[in-house]
């Protein structure tokens, strides 16, 4: 973090992050007000992302909502539907899988906006509807670092609870000072059998609990 006005810390590379801001926080009268806003959380890029600063971990955190993710066929109403939902006093959008065989969901974040030295966890936040089907085969989840190193695992959604939000962990990582700068890619993939009834809220990136 960067020290502002004595002992108050704000997030690493905050200026670059705030370029995507939906509301101009620089119009606020003081850094303390700015600090309050970033610790509470602020929306970026037309409410497709949310940034907040974790005071305890002194770490930047992000939620990449479904509109910020690359979801194959998501613009085709035969396969996906976009539903409004309320969160943090704002109307956002969640993607609902109607019927698809080719499940491909990808999120990206630049290492430059994450806090160095923090052990992060990335996880997709999803829900299975009561009528969900086609999830007998596990989904492949993958985390790919800028240097090309990968973490890969399989997650069985068949036994997950219905009608509640839950997290699919993609992996853990840490940004070291001097490490390769670039994109980290997170994905859920499953190209077998027809699937339906998955709601995708987004991808959360925050300190490992």
UniProtKB/Swiss-Prot annotation:
Pfam families: PP2. InterPro entries: PP2-like, PP2-like/Lectin. One of its GO terms (molecular function) is carbohydrate binding. Keywords: Hemagglutinin, Lectin. The keyword tRNA processing does not apply. The keyword DNA repair does not apply. The record marks 102 as: Important for carbohydrate binding. PANTHER family: LECTIN-LIKE. Binds chito-oligosaccherides. Has hemagglutinating activity towards rabbit erythrocytes. Homodimer; non-covalently linked. This is Lectin.
């Amino acid at each position: 973090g960067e020290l502002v006005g004595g002992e108050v810390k704000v997030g690493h590379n905050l200026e670059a992050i705030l370029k995507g801001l939906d509301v101009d926080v620089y119009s606020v009268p003081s850094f303390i007000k700015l600090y309050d806003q970033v610790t509470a959380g602020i929306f970026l890029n037309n409410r497709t992302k949310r940034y907040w600063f974790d005071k305890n971990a002194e770490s930047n955190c992000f939620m990449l909502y479904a509109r910020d993710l690359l979801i194959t066929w998501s613009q085709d109403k035969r396969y996906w539907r976009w539903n409004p939902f309320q969160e943090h006093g704002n109307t956002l959008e969640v993607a609902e899988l109607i019927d698809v065989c080719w499940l491909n969901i990808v999120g990206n974040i630049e290492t430059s906006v994450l806090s160095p030295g923090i052990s992060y966890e990335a996880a997709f936040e999803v829900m299975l509807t009561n009528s969900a089907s086609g999830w007998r085969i596990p989904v492949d989840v993958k985390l790919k670092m800028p240097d090309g190193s990968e973490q890969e695992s399989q997650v069985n959604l068949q036994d997950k609870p219905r009608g509640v939000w839950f997290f699919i962990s993609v992996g853990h990582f840490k940004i070291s000072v001097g490490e390769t700068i670039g994109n980290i890619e997170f994905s859920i993939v499953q190209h077998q059998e027809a699937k339906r009834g998955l709601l995708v809220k987004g991808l959360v990136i925050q300190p490992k609990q």
